[in-house]
C-alpha cells in the first residue's frame, strides 16, 4: 500500500458525524506530518465549506465521490490506505465501499450497527479481504468499541490472575448521558425495511452467534425483559444496543480462537437502581423506544451538549469459585457523537500505523487492534479502561 496518496480518507466529511471526525483529525493530527488524510463527500462545494469553516489546511485534499457510482468509489479506495466512512445506513450506502476495499487491499472502518448487513458482507467479502490484505473493521463507534474492548480488557485481566478466562461476563450500563445518534435510528429503520424483503434476516438478528462464522455456543442469558441482578442488587432493563454488541463480542471470541472459551456467555443490560423505584424504571425503559427522539440523520446535538455528555459501563466477570472481577469503561463526551467521532478516528489511525502484521479479513475492534487501540483511546480520545473493586 506504499503507493497510496493518503493514510486515511474521511468519507462523509460533510455530514454531522463526519464533520466531528474532521474536527478531531484537525485538532489531534493537524500538525502531525506523519499522517496524511483527505476529506471525501458527494458535493465539492460542501467539502470546501466544511474545510473553510473548520480551518482545515488547503493541503488536505478534497475528494468528490458519488456513492451510487462504483468507479467513483474505486477511485477513492485506490488512493488511500484506509477508508473511514460515516455514511450510513451502511446497508444502503456501504456495500460498494466494502466491495472495493476488499478487492483492492484497502483498510476500512465504519460505525455500523447493522448485523444483518454485516452478516452479508462477511459471507460475500471476507475471503477476498484475506487474499488482498484488506483489514475491514466494523462497529468502531459507541457500538461496539466500549463493549467489545471492555470485555477484552477484563478477560485479559482474568486470565492474568487465574490462568483461564471467565465463562460468563455481564455488561451493565451505569450511565449514558447525551442524545442518541440519528444515524443509529436510521439504521434501525433500514433494517426493519430490509426484513420485508429478506425475512431470513430475522434469524440473523435473533441469534447472538450470527456473526460467529457458523459457531453456535451455549444458550445466553435473556436480555429482552427487566430482571433483578442479584449480584449487583439492582434492577436492570433491556439495553437497545445489546443486539449488535453481543454479536460483536461473540465474533471477537471466534476471531481470537475462542480466547474467552467455547462456553462463553455474555449479556448486556442497563442499570436502573434497587427497590420498587428501580423496578418501575426498568419496566418503563423496557417498554419505551429510546431512539424515538433521536435527531434526524445529518443533525445532532450542540457542542455544549456533546461536551456535557458521558457514559460509564461496568463489566462483571463471574468466576467458577463464586467470586467476581469488575472492570469499567467510561467516556468523557456523549456516546453517539462526541465520543464516537474520536473512537472511529483513532481506529483508522491505529489500523494504518500500528497494525502492520494484521492479516486481511473482516474484523471487530478487539481482535484487530486490542491493546493498541485501548492505549490510543486512553491517551487521546477521553476513554478510561480500569479495574474496580
Predicted segment positions?
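N-terminal Rossmann NAD(P)H-binding glycine-rich loop of SDR-like oxidoreductase domains
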Residues: 6-27
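C-terminal catalytic/substrate-binding lobe primarily of soluble NAD(P)-dependent oxidoreductases
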Residues: 18, 131, 156-389
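Conserved glycine-rich Rossmann-like NAD(P)H-binding loop of the short-chain dehydrogenase/reductase
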Residues: 30-46
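Short, conserved SAM-binding/catalytic segment
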Residues: 50-57
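Conserved Rossmann-fold cofactor-binding substructure of NAD(P)-dependent oxidoreductases
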Residues: 64-80, 86-92
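ADP-ribose/adenylate-binding Rossmann-like module
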Residues: 89, 100-118
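Rossmann-fold NAD(P)-binding glycine/threonine-rich loop
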Residues: 112-134
Amino acid at each position: 500500500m506504499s503507493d497510496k496518496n493518503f493514510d486515511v480518507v474521511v468519507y462523509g466529511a460533510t455530514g454531522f458525524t463526519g464533520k466531528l471526525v474532521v474536527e478531531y483529525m484537525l485538532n489531534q493530527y493537524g500538525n502531525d506530518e506523519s499522517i496524511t488524510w483527505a476529506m471525501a463527500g458527494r458535493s465539492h462545494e460542501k467539502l470546501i465549506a466544511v474545510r473553510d469553516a473548520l480551518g482545515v489546511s488547503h493541503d488536505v485534499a478534497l475528494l468528490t465521490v458519488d456513492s451510487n457510482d462504483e468507479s467513483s468509489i474505486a477511485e477513492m479506495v485506490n488512493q488511500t490506505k484506509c477508508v473511514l466512512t460515516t455514511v450510513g445506513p451502511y446497508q444502503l450506502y456501504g456495500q460498494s465501499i466494502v466491495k472495493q476495499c476488499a478487492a483492492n487491499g484497502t483498510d476500512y472502518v465504519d460505525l455500523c450497527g447493522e448485523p444483518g448487513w454485516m452478516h452479508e458482507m462477511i459471507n460475500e467479502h471476507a475471503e477476498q479481504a484475506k487474499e488482498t490484505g484488506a483489514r475491514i473493521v466494523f462497529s468502531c463507534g459507541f457500538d461496539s468499541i466500549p463493549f467489545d474492548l471492555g470485555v477484552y480488557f477484563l478477560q485479559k485481566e482474568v486470565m492474568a490472575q487465574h490462568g483461564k478466562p471467565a465463562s460468563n461476563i455481564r455488561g451493565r450500563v451505569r450511565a449514558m448521558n447525551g442524545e442518541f445518534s440519528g444515524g443509529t435510528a436510521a439504521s434501525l429503520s433500514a433494517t426493519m425495511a430490509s426484513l420485508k424483503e429478506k425475512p431470513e434476516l430475522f434469524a440473523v438478528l435473533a441469534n447472538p452467534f450470527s456473526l460467529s462464522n457458523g459457531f453456535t455456543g451455549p444458550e445466553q442469558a435473556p436480555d429482552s425483559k427487566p430482571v433483578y441482578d442479584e449480584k449487583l442488587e439492582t434492577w436492570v432493563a433491556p439495553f437497545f444496543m445489546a443486539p449488535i454488541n453481543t454479536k460483536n463480542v461473540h465474533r471477537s471470541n471466534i476471531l481470537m480462537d475462542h480466547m474467552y472459551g467455547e462456553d462463553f456467555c455474555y449479556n448486556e443490560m442497563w442499570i436502573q437502581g434497587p427497590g420498587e423505584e428501580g423496578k418501575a424504571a426498568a419496566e418503563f425503559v423496557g417498554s419505551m423506544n429510546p431512539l424515538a427522539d433521536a435527531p434526524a440523520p445529518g443533525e445532532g446535538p450542540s457542542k455544549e451538549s456533546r461536551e456535557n455528555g458521558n457514559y460509564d459501563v461496568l463489566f462483571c466477570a463471574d468466576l467458577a469459585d463464586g467470586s467476581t472481577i469488575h472492570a469499567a469503561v467510561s467516556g468523557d463526551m456523549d456516546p453517539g457523537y462526541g465520543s464516537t467521532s474520536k473512537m472511529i478516528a483513532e481506529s483508522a489511525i491505529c489500523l494504518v500505523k500500528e497494525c502492520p502484521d494484521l492479516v486481511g479479513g473482516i474484523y471487530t475492534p478487539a481482535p484487530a487492534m486490542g491493546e493498541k487501540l485501548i492505549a490510543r483511546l486512553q491517551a487521546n480520545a477521553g476513554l478510561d479502561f480500569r479495574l474496580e473493586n
